[in-house]
Amino acid sequence: MKKLSTALVAATAALAMMAEGYQVNTFSAKQEGMGHVGVAMKLGAESQIFNPGALSFMNKTMEVSGAMSAIKATAKADVDGTGYETSNKVSTPMNFSAAFRIYDNLYAGVTLYTPYGSSINWGKSWPGAVLNQSCDLKVFTVQPTVSWRILPKLSVGAGLMISWGSVDLKKGLVPASSMDKLVNLQYEAAMLQYKAAQLAAMIPGTPAPGEAPVKTGYTYGNMPPASVGLKGNSELALGFNIGAMYDITDKWTVGASFRSKMEMKVKAGDASVEYADEMARATLGSTLDNLNYANFSAQMPCPYVLTAGVAYKPIERLTLAFDAQLNGWGTYKNLDIEFAGLEAYNQHLEKNYKNAMTYHLGGQFAMTE
């Protein structure tokens, strides 16, 4: 009989995402409701993502599943007592999985999912604009998987991750404070010229100077006078996903999995420069417009993920699960953006992320047999 289950949410996705950066864990609606647990659970075709070793515990000849989530996240920042908030669009992480039996103890499958991605929009004018105004990052992975149940209670599995993605990043290119200083220097230089002309006018036959330059008092505030848009597609990246599962008893199951690090590399992305106003264009355009005709290269990591967990069935219809996950963000030291033939404009952005632990606790109750 088809089972009807309800999730007992014990750890929310929001808490997990704080330490997961641009990692995506919303691989199925069921697991999202359960706080993203899954490494010690027998999830059928979806096990290819959470723990490839669990796939060979599938009790069907063939299974196909799919899920899509709609996420609208919000981030806030407080800078010197002023609050700032993102205006993000809806993101739609998804997965589609299919698996089939080869032998009673050998299963294979393939899954398509989005392990990493981010959509954030701080707007053009905020104190961190020179680092990030907006970013739309997408990573897709196709993973063929094989799982072998070595013993009745022990199974292992492995999958080859074939990944590609795209990035659309906008950031300030020139700090607003630098432009304010430049405008002030231009005014002071104009005043020196005007005063020199006044002195020269004291000599008979020398024409009087025109009107004195006027200091507008205008400042760019948090608005970078020039911003750069970077858009590109990554090359294929390869990684692996391995896992194991063991039934200690009929009630207790343990599992572990490891997804390797991948480097997403853009080798020939497109750059475009946008100016805050005509004064910025007139002042900076002759220097920065060359970027509109340059390609950029960059790379960023999809860090490794090590997960271990336990599942417990206190009664037949109730399953409780706990996962501990180590996210290898320590591999993200910096982001280097290099422009072909225009090395003077290369960007070196320090990241220095730290490894982070996340903990997931959830459960489900089967309402029917």
Language-model regions: role of each:
Residues M1-A19:
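Gram-negative bacterial Sec-dependent N-terminal signal peptides
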Residues V9-A10, V37, V266:
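Enrichment for repetitive, rod-forming helical segments
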Residues A14-L15, E63, S155:
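Hydrophobic alpha-helical membrane context
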Residues E20-G33, K60, A77-E85, S91-E369:
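Outer-membrane beta-barrel porins/channels
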Residues Q31-Q48:
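N-terminal targeting signals for Sec/Tat export/insertion, comprising classic cleavable signal peptides
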Residues H36-V39, E63-K76, G83:
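Short strand-turn segments of transmembrane beta-barrel domains in outer membranes
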Residues A45-I71:
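N-terminal, post-signal-peptide region of Sec/Tat-exported proteins
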